């Protein structure tokens, strides 16, 4: 994703002491670009009051990889389970490792949150403590609370096949029908339910208020939505769990205004239960 390419370039350049001045200039340029792109990183940290902050696992750092889509989707799954009182901390490195077996995967390792769901169902998953680095061999067994699982069995225990629904809002496509999300990162050609943006926003807000895990993306980045806040002027924001580590103005959280959500969102993933509001609801509106 574009933002992550710029971030990786910045990290590479700052290695050289001779390039310190240019690195500082590049950092300022990128900071400005990122703020303009999705307005989650303000030039000066603002004060936010949290209205809802759902439970989450510790903030992780994707480093120089372009795998935010893995971190964001797994973070949403983790928050979903924490809401049930079921503690689970999943390894993004396991999914990244499995990409080596996917011939369609680009060298950049870019993808969609729905790609994470497909890989999780196909290859399984393990706990974070069992695989903290992509260079670590993927475990053949998962040991959890005295039980032993294969990675596939463990994956089914944390994310049932078909449990999540992918949503998008595209005025050029029929609403309430499934269509392919036409972005380069959707190399598995996954299909999303297309709904009006006002409906997508309302579904997302309700899901967060009901403590569900939600995965969000714009054209440059993906994060998990973990809460709702407002600033001192009363403007409302979604609280995002990012995957760029904790050495940031808000300790690894970011804030996307409701208005910016409506302008930049290209897709959201949540459980079908969160989407319906209750199980079995016949009315998607």
Regions inferred by a protein language model and the residue ranges of each:
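Bacterial Sec-dependent signal peptides at the C-terminal "C-region" and cleavage site
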Residues: 33-47
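Active-site signature of cysteine proteases
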Residues: 57, 146-285
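Cross-family signature of deubiquitinases and ubiquitin-like deconjugating cysteine proteases
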Residues: 42-43, 55-83, 98
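Compositionally biased, intrinsically disordered low-complexity segments enriched in Pro/Arg/Gln/His
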Residues: 28-29
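Acidic, Ala/Val/Gly-enriched low-complexity intrinsically disordered segments
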Residues: 4-6, 15-17
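Papain-like cysteine protease catalytic cores
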Residues: 88-153
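Active-site nucleophilic cysteine motif
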Residues: 62-78, 105-118, 221
